[in-house]
């Protein structure tokens, strides 16, 4: 896991979800790929995100509980781990601490 991205463009306007509980910025690479760098603040209820393209969520710091699609069981992910969500799907995520992540948009 690299600690920085080089040779990128960053969209200055932030993506704000759930009243500010999740904030990210889009990073565009020279080859046209995109990622978002974000933070999720502690949540009392799971946040539900819908995907349009496949996404790989890389946890940079913190830990979270994730439920993918219609699964009933959640999984715990910590810094250094990733989880994959298919396109045209959804996932629920919740955290008790500040969570830093990179969302790799793979579509």
Regions found by a protein language model. Give the residues of each.
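A short, N-terminal "cap"/entry segment at the start of jelly-roll beta-barrel domains
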Residues: 1-37
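Short loop/turn motifs at secondary-structure junctions and domain boundaries
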Residues: 18, 47-49, 66-67
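A generic structural motif
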Residues: 28-30, 67-69, 94, 106
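Conserved short histidine dyad/triad with adjacent acidic residue
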Residues: 28-52, 84-87
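Short acidic-glycine-tyrosine-enriched beta hairpin
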Residues: 40, 69-88
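Short, conserved beta-strand element in jelly-roll/cupin
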Residues: 51-66
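Ligand-binding loop in jelly-roll beta-barrel domains
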Residues: 86-107
């Amino acid at each position: 896991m690299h600690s920085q991205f080089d040779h990128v463009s960053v969209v200055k306007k932030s993506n704000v979800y759930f009243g500010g509980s999740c904030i990210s910025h889009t990073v565009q690479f020279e080859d046209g790929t995109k990622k978002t760098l974000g933070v999720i603040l502690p949540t009392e209820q799971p946040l539900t995100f819908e995907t349009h393209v496949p996404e790989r969520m890389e946890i940079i710091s913190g830990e979270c509980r994730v439920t993918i699609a219609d699964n009933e069981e959640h999984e715990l992910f910590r810094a250094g781990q990733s989880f994959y969500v298919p396109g045209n799907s959804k996932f629920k995520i919740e955290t008790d601490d500040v969570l830093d992540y990179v969302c790799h948009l793979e579509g």
